[in-house]
Amino acid sequence: MSKVYMMVTITNRNKRKDFRTFFKEYGLPVFLETTGRGTAQSEVLDYFGLEESEKLLFLAIVTGETWKKLRRGLITKMLIDVPGTGVSFIVPLSSVGGRKPLQFLVNEQEFEKEEETAMKDTDYELLVAIANQGYIDTVMDAARAAK
């Protein structure tokens, strides 16, 4: 049985071609790539070794085994552990809406669906919001005000 995770990789935009090639070479043909503008304060950027600039964000659904291979490659080939190169991390997923979308997202990865269980109580949840251009300040104000 396999657990699935959302892998998030944030890097500079000039690394687009390198990361696309890397993900395909490591058996990850399905990923979302989008541009981003950070809202983190400078202390947070310093902690993760990021600079204030326009960023590139890659999102992919990976299994635990795929993440192990990718993590090694991100360090040895992409040098993601070097400050200023970027950051990559995974977030466990508790649910994916439907069998077909799940099969598409884990395309070419070895995956055996686990038995369905009830949602677990957790200390934190990640909420992903997609907003139209010009509304980022409104969304971030609401997120910061949430308790």
Give residue spans per PLM region.
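Positively charged, small/polar-rich N-terminal and surface patches that mediate targeting and assembly
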Residues: 1-147
